[in-house]
């Protein structure tokens, strides 16, 4: 996925799923399944239920995304 094609949205983590997947509710009300980006996984960034996150999505599949940032 090219960086300029990505859509970045803000959301809140609703649920933790197996294999470092998360259910995230976006600000517009949609619920998507998201996984952690490689740099967050490498640096052991912990994501818990209720965290505010930035999700990067592709325009081709708006039901899946990648968590690229966790707000403090």
Swiss-Prot record:
Q: Which residues form the S1-like domain?
A: 1-72
What GO terms are given for molecular function? ribosome binding; rRNA binding; translation initiation factor activity
Q: Where in or outside the cell is it found? A: Cytoplasm
Q: What does the entry list under GO cellular component?
A: cytosol
Which InterPro entries does UniProt cross-reference here? NA-bd_OB-fold, RNA-binding_domain_S1_IF1, S1_domain, TIF_IF1
Instruction: List, alphabetically, the SMART domains matched.
Output: S1
Pfam families according to UniProt: eIF-1a
Which key words are in the record?
Cytoplasm, Initiation factor, Protein biosynthesis, RNA-binding, rRNA-binding
Please tell me where this protein is predominantly located.
cytoplasm
The record's comment on protein family reads: Belongs to the IF-1 family.
Which purpose does this protein serve, as stated in its record?
One of the essential components for the initiation of protein synthesis. Stabilizes the binding of IF-2 and IF-3 on the 30S subunit to which N-formylmethionyl-tRNA(fMet) subsequently binds. Helps modulate mRNA selection, yielding the 30S pre-initiation complex (PIC). Upon addition of the 50S ribosomal subunit IF-1, IF-2 and IF-3 are released leaving the mature 70S translation initiation complex.
Subunit (UniProt): Component of the 30S ribosomal translation pre-initiation complex which assembles on the 30S ribosome in the order IF-2 and IF-3, IF-1 and N-formylmethionyl-tRNA(fMet); mRNA recruitment can occur at any time during PIC assembly.
What HAMAP family does this protein's entry cite? IF_1
Name by which UniProt lists this protein:
Translation initiation factor IF-1
Q: Which organism is it from?
A: Aliivibrio fischeri (strain ATCC 700601 / ES114)
Q: Which gene encodes it?
A: infA
